[in-house]
Structures are given as structure tokens and as C-alpha cells.
């Protein structure tokens, strides 16, 4: 017995669309390319009508009784479907959680850089996890870290809303911000 090949070199089996001669049902409910019902016709006659018009007979609904077919240009139909799929894929944005890390003893410029990063993440539609991490005995100053996170939330209030207030989690203090759906209207002091 010859050894079995290590890799399956066969081409993947693609499910071919049910068009023209691949349709095996004897009776079909046929819809014209304009959307007009042609009624229940046998398969051979429906294929003749499609070929006379230079179009394809495409199985639309297999579960109906009798199955529904449509006379259309299959190449054009397939192109439109792929175009729609690309558009929906382009429009959909998966929200990710981006993290901005810092210590509670952060310098002004470093803080401004973290604010800039957070603004960029929020504008692209992602959530932001603001983390203040402690080393050694710094954990005793968790109130300063909470103050820093609240200041950050205040500085970012035009772009974001606080999803989770600052809370301690192990040796870190975290806060979650999400992009603001409606623009913030500032109250005028007068």
C-alpha cells in the first residue's frame, strides 16, 4: 500500500451556484428579468426562454414549492453581490479597546502625549482603557492616581464619556472611556 500523502493537494470543493443546466427540478416558478411572473414552467422551456434572451436561469429559492428561478445576467448579478459585500465590509468597524498607560507621577508633556493618543483612539471609534500602574510602595498613593484619571476624563469630555469610573485592579488603577455619540453642548456661564 503506498504511503498516504502528507498534505491534501486536492483543490477545495467549491459549491457551484445553481444556474442553467445545474438546476435539476422539473417544474420551476420563473420570474422575468424585469420582475414579472412568467408562472410555473418546466425546466427545459425556462432554459430556452433564458437562452433566447441571452441571459441565465438562476435558482433563487430552493425551498419554495415549486422552486423559484429568475432570468438574469448571472455575471452582472454576482458582480453586484461582491460589490455590496465589499461596501458592507468597508463600513463595518470593529471597536477595539486601546490602552493608554502611565504612572501617577507623570510629567506635563508625557500627559499631553497620552491625551493625544486617547483622542486619536476615540476619533477612530475605539474604546480607551486608561491605566495608572504602581511600583512598590506607590500603591499607597492610589488617591493621586484616581485624581489623575478623573482629570484625564475631564480633559477628554468633549470626545468621550466615562464608561467605568476609576477603580483599583491589582497593582493598577483603571478607567474606561468610550467615544461620545452626541456632541457635548457646553453651558455658557453668564
Curated annotation (Swiss-Prot):
InterPro entries xref list: T_IF-3_C_sf, T_IF-3_N_sf, Translation_initiation_fac3_CS, Translation_initiation_fac_3, Translation_initiation_fac_3_C, Translation_initiation_fac_3_N
Entry keyword annotation includes Cytoplasm: yes
Disulfide bonds: none
Entry GO CC: cytosol; membrane
Gene Ontology biological process: ribosome disassembly
Pfam families hit by this protein: IF3_C, IF3_N
Subcellular location(s) per record: Cytoplasm
Any one GO molecular-function label of the UniProt entry: translation initiation factor activity
Keyword annotations of the record: Cytoplasm, Initiation factor, Protein biosynthesis
Function, in words: IF-3 binds to the 30S ribosomal subunit and shifts the equilibrium between 70S ribosomes and their 50S and 30S subunits in favor of the free subunits, thus enhancing the availability of 30S subunits on which protein synthesis initiation begins.
Entries under PANTHER family matching the protein: TRANSLATION INITIATION FACTOR IF-3 (PTHR10938), TRANSLATION INITIATION FACTOR IF-3, MITOCHONDRIAL (PTHR10938:SF0)
Family designation: Belongs to the IF-3 family.
Record note on quaternary structure: Monomer.
Name recorded for this polypeptide: Translation initiation factor IF-3
Organism, as annotated: Prochlorococcus marinus subsp. pastoris (strain CCMP1986 / NIES-2087 / MED4)
Lineage of the species this protein comes from: Bacteria, Bacillati, Cyanobacteriota, Cyanophyceae, Synechococcales
Amino acid at each position: 500500500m503506498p504511503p498516504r500523502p502528507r498534505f491534501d493537494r486536492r483543490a477545495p470543493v467549491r459549491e457551484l451556484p445553481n444556474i442553467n443546466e445545474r438546476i435539476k427540478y422539473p417544474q420551476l416558478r420563473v420570474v422575468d428579468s424585469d420582475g414579472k411572473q412568467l408562472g410555473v414552467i418546466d425546466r427545459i422551456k425556462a432554459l430556452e426562454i433564458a437562452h433566447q434572451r441571452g441571459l441565465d436561469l438562476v435558482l433563487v429559492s430552493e425551498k419554495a414549492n415549486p422552486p423559484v428561478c429568475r432570468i438574469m445576467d448571472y455575471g452582472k448579478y454576482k458582480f453586484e453581490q461582491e460589490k455590496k459585500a465589499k461596501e458592507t465590509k468597508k463600513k463595518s468597524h470593529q471597536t477595539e479597546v486601546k490602552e493608554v498607560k502611565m504612572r501617577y507621577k507623570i510629567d506635563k508633556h508625557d500627559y499631553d502625549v497620552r491625551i493625544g493618543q486617547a483622542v486619536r483612539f476615540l476619533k477612530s471609534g475605539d474604546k480607551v482603557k486608561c491605566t495608572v500602574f504602581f511600583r512598590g510602595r506607590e500603591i499607597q498613593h492610589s488617591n493621586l492616581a484616581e485624581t489623575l484619571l478623573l482629570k484625564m476624563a475631564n480633559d477628554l469630555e468633549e470626545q468621550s464619556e466615562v464608561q467605568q469610573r476609576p477603580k483599583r485592579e491589582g497593582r493598577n488603577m483603571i478607567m474606561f472611556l468610550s467615544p461620545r455619540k452626541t456632541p457635548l453642548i457646553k453651558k455658557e456661564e453668564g
